[in-house]
Amino acid sequence: MNYDKKTIRDIDVSGKKILLRCDFNVPHDKATGVIHDDTRIVSTLPTIRYLLDHNAAVILLSHMGRPHGEWKKELSLFSARDHLEELLEMPVPLTEDVLGPDTKAKCAALQPGQVVLVENLRFRLEEEKNDPEFAKELASLADIFVFDAFGAAHRAHASTEGVSHYLPSVAGLLVEKELEFMGKALDDPKRPLVAILGGSKVSDKIGVINNLLQKADTILIGGGMAYTFQAALGRDIGTSLLDANHVGYAKDMIAKAQEMGVKLLLPQDNLAAKEFSADADPILVDAAAFPHDLMGMDIGPKTIEDFTGAIAGAGTVIWNGPMGVFEFPAFANGTNAVAKAMADQKDAVTIVGGGDSSSAVEKSGFADKLSHISTGVGASLEFLEGLVLPGIACLADKD
């Protein structure tokens, strides 16, 4: 997939109506509408402001949750609208329907320098079905389509891919940044390239591991998925998380890494516990002599030393997935140590690939010291797998 896409900087937007696909699918209190994390809204502000500063009229599109074509008040975009008005310090009208009379009237009346937000697109079933007529109707509202919803880039929906068949289509500034960092890290990285993989299941990361084995110099494996790799070495893992269907795959990957000259580091030691609880006492165990009645909860100090040492020598670091149960303070050391080691690498390109690892970095306090934190979850994973993302592939390539 070509990552060198045209952006809003490459076209004239003055006096034009812009259909801007954002990702305002933010965690919020369904009763009060209070937003818990506004990262996705804040991340697209540079694009909105650029368009307004260049005399464009901006029609914002987004989804929220999974209403399955039903109108659900708790999944309305009113909370995102209210927050946007505060951030932009200007009115942001919210349409009362999706492509009904109110949407069409508000968009028709929109002037350069003004913004309107269309209500949750998933209130219409046609959105997720990528219905061509629905996409065509959306496109009829504007002159240009701008895609800035990286978190939805892996979805071929009417507002992410469908509209591109009817309008000139370019990337927003957030998507430009995602492609610049994630694309270069995979295709032309500053070496050595160190990939850190964590999280629960091996099955969730099969495509990522397969792709990174072709590209990385070193792969560090922690989190719940590491116990499946330990089991592949014939080790006892006690009551730790085991992806039993993928022990054979893990064994093959260990052999393949060796064959390809990729350094694959697994935990030497772990912090374990008798039960999965925030109050459980951490017990340090050797990975090669794991007690049968304990479960692994985090990587241990020797492993932290190994992993941070590998990060210290890196030119590029990509991280996806926590090293342990970071939500429990007693088992957050490994995750925090990785975040700190990345933050300390001033000369390296340091990228966090969305999801739990992004939350962990924010919680660790090192987020502002890293090169890039992806706003995608599923999109970031599919990007790391080397898959084609429909929301990106449909955008115009640079000349």
Give the predicted meaning of each segment.
Residues 1-399:
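Active-site loop-to-helix "anion-binding N-cap" substructures in soluble metabolic enzymes
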